[in-house]
Structures are given as C-alpha cells and as structure tokens.
C-alpha cells in the first residue's frame, strides 16, 4: 500500500477512535428516548454536549477512559519498540492511580488486586472466576484498535492485551475481531466479510455469532444498544462496530447513528470510530471534530511517533 494511504489510515484509526469517544460522551448512558429529548435535532458538535453531573466531569472535546487506555497501549509500543505485556499493565495501573476517570468497575476490580502489575492476566482470571465467569464487559474491546496497527501477530497480541483485564472468551474474541478488521483495512485495503468474522468468532466463543449475524443482516436497532441492563456488554459494542463497518457510507454517518442510539455510546462510538477511520482515512473525519478535540496536537504527535516505527 502507498505510504500516504497507510499514514491516512493510521491517523484515521486513532483519531477516529478519539473523536467517536469524545462525541459519544454526549449520549453515554442515555436511553434512545432521552437522546431524542436532549438532542431533538441530533448532534453536530462538542459544544452541544449537555452538562449534567456525569458529562461535566470532562471538558467538551475531551475523550474518556476508552481512548486513555488505548493510548497507554500505544505509548508502551513506542517506548518499548515491541509488545511488552507487563509494561502495558504498569501503564494501565499508573493511569488508574492518577485518577483513571471513567474506569469501569470490572477493570478497577482487576487492577486493584495486590500483585496486578506482576501477574495481570492471573488477576483478570481470578476476578472473572469470582464472578462465575459471567462478566463480559466492553472495557477491553474499547482500547484494542491500536493493536490492529501492529505489523504482525495481531490476533495473539490482541488476545494477550485483552486478558490484562478481561479474561472472558467473548471479550477476547471481540478484541481479536476488531483488531483484525483494522489490520486488514490499514495494511491490505481489505474488508472482512461475514464468513471471515464468524470464522474468527468461532475460535473463541459461539455466543459471538448471533451478534455478527444481527450486524450483517439487520438494522442497528436490532442490537438494542441502550438496553439498560446490558449496555456495557462487549458483544453489543462489537455488533455496533460491525454494523457501521458493513453498512455506513461515511465516517460521519456511521458515528452519528451510533451516538444517537444512546447506551454505552462513548465506547460504541470509540470502537466504531476506529474502524470507520481505518476504512475512510483521517481526511474523511469532519475537520471540526478532529480539530475540536481538546488534545488534538498531542494525539497527532503520538500517532506520528508510532507510525515512525514503520519507516
């Protein structure tokens, strides 16, 4: 692939995630009815984000924990010039200890275990088993986009980085699928079809398959993204991302559909945004959304440093 296209998609992936995350905060935890009430004319800009008790914790144009944790992974790749699982775990823990705003309950419980930084995957397994192997939250898939930008061993690295906090095979499969999709877009200009994705899903957990089917054959509403009891389920987030991957005709169209669906909208839009950014490139992300990010220049520098590893 041409270097310019590769760089476009590299930047598109990371900015796509950050923009989706920052815009998704506008409707996070809202039902579809609440979204329609607070944003009767939709949303076009960070300045429109309502300032309630939850949202006012972030400045408009800031991203949340989804992108913070993804950047812990990116920073580790750059600092170590390789994948170092324990270094990533240390960065996660440091982020948590320095505020970790927006951190999910499951992620917190795993990282709060005493020897987390020396044996993170064991900590994740312990917490998962303590919860009777039921927990399959979206706290790992939300940060996995950058793993798709590695040149090789994408599936293996996505598995291992997922298991730093989320041990359930539904989480692991979600991460491998999203990272593989991004890798195929960025490095091969290739779209994975439904059979490809189901092939990956079946290696991890059969329960992933129905969500792949919904995303491929049905409307976005079929995924019930604002379901009050399970909006943070990894397979809802995966389904939303797959839906825009296969059906959205532009970055903007795809992101707004996800954001206006409510539920765990910042995470759904972060993952969907990374995939859409990888597909369409950074130039197709509306300029006001890119430049409106609070830390746009810092983000650009970080991506440049990561991209430089490929020279």
Indicate where each model-derived feature is located.
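Structured, active/binding-site neighborhoods that engage oxygen-rich ligands
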Residues: 1-311
């Amino acid at each position: 692939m041409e270097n310019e296209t590769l760089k476009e998609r590299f930047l598109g992936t990371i900015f796509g995630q950050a923009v989706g995350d920052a815009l998704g905060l506008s409707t996070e935890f809202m039902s579809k009815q609440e979204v329609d009430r607070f944003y009767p004319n939709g949303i076009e800009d960070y300045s429109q984000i309502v300032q309630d008790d939850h949202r006012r914790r972030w400045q408009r144009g800031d991203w949340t924990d989804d992108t913070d944790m993804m950047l812990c992974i990116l920073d580790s790749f750059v600092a170590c010039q390789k994948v170092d699982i324990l270094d990533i775990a240390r960065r996660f823990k440091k982020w948590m200890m320095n505020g970790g705003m927006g951190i999910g309950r499951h992620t917190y419980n795993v990282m709060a275990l005493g020897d987390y930084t020396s044996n993170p995957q064991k900590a994740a397994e312990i917490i998962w088993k303590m919860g009777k192997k039921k927990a399959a939250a979206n706290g790992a898939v939300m940060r996995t986009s950058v793993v798709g930008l590695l040149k090789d061993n994408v599936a293996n690295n996505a598995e291992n980085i997922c298991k730093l906090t989320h041990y359930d095979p539904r989480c692991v499969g979600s991460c491998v699928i999203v990272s593989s999709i991004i890798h195929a877009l960025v490095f091969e200009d290739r779209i994975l079809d439904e059979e490809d994705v189901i092939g990956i899903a079946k290696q991890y957990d059969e329960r992933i398959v129905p969500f792949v089917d919904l995303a491929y054959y049905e409307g976005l509403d079929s995924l019930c993204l604002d379901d009050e009891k399970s909006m943070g389920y990894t397979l809802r987030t995966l389904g939303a991302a797959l839906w825009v991957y296969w059906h959205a005709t532009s970055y903007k169209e795809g992101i707004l559909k996800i954001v206006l669906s409510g539920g765990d909208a910042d995470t759904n839009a972060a993952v969907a945004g990374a995939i859409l950014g990888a597909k369409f490139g950074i130039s197709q992300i509306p300029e006001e959304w890119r430049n409106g990010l609070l830390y746009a220049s810092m983000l650009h520098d970080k991506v440049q440093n990561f991209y430089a590893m490929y020279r």
